[in-house]
Amino acid sequence: MHKFWPRHSPNFMACRVAVRTVQPRDITVGLSGGADSLALVAALCAEDYNVHALCVDHGLQPGSHEVAQQAAHHARTFGAHAEIISVTVAPGNLEANARTARYQALHSRNLPVVVGHTADDQAETLLLGALRGKATGMQIHTDNLWRPLLGVRRATTLAACTELGIEPWHDPHNANTDFLRVALRTQVVPLLSDIIGGDAVPALSQAATLIAEDTHALHVDTPDDRIAQLAGMPPALRRRHLVALLQAYGARVSAAHLRAVDALITNWHGQKAVPVGNGLEVTRKDGRLSVS
């Protein structure tokens, strides 16, 4: 390992301390070229991880391949192995489909995956989920995915890049308020900070972390489809079973779907089957919920 960082680099040191939570030493790291992922790759290299930096080119913007090449160059100067992979994003929901394609590429190398989500991303995730009727949060480690920077601010990763003497890529999509996450980041979070007279991100991020921990504790591996058992559960636990049941069949899970399916259990009056997307529907039959 060669030392590529200056002696005085407190922001970069904060990133280095954060990544020490990552347990596997051979890892794939998602690298967009932005400040978060550059600081992440650099910190992992400084901590002597065997880093395979994967630059996913979605091909959605002019010059995207050049951005990926520059990101890969930075990663190699840190001592990482770097690779560029091009993906095709399915039409429809651009954000969601790009994310799906990106994670498929990252997991294709059969190594634990590390990504650069920060505390700011955690706060935005909470608000996004709340607006969709289901507040959510991210965990530092789930299955084969690590997010070690969840306790680090976006401003810290940007400052770390400055300390390292590198200029991160600034994604034009991050200025497009047509994307809900961007609108929350640039309009709602600053407004909340003004209202409380301070930075709203730490409290939002902490709330999201607590929700993520609760979600993990209540995770259901094998959902129960028996009406009597479901009816006797506390509502929060019953919802977990319904979510797991719908996901097991590839149905869409929304607040409206959950309410309608829950009514088959708690407010049964002979209602018809509940459509749950992807051509599937849920019916109540012989004391069980059936998805077909």
Swiss-Prot record:
Catalytic activity: cytidine(34) in tRNA(Ile2) + L-lysine + ATP = lysidine(34) in tRNA(Ile2) + AMP + diphosphate + H(+)
UniProt keywords, alphabetically: ATP-binding, Cytoplasm, Ligase, Nucleotide-binding, tRNA processing
Enzyme class, first EC level, given as a word: ligase
GO molecular function, one term: tRNA(Ile)-lysidine synthase activity
Compartment(s): Cytoplasm
Enzyme Commission number(s): 6.3.4.19
Assigned GO CC terms: cytoplasm
Single biological process term from Gene Ontology: tRNA modification
Pfam families per record: ATP_bind_3, TilS
Record: residues binding ATP: 32-37
tRNA processing among keywords: yes
Similarity annotation: Belongs to the tRNA(Ile)-lysidine synthase family.
Function per UniProt: Ligates lysine onto the cytidine present at position 34 of the AUA codon-specific tRNA(Ile) that contains the anticodon CAU, in an ATP-dependent manner. Cytidine is converted to lysidine, thus changing the amino acid specificity of the tRNA from methionine to isoleucine.
Free-text note on domains in this protein's UniProt record: The N-terminal region contains the highly conserved SGGXDS motif, predicted to be a P-loop motif involved in ATP binding.
HAMAP family the UniProt entry points to: tRNA_Ile_lys_synt
Name by which UniProt lists this protein: tRNA(Ile)-lysidine synthase
Natural source organism: Corynebacterium diphtheriae (strain ATCC 700971 / NCTC 13129 / Biotype gravis)
Gene it is expressed from: tilS
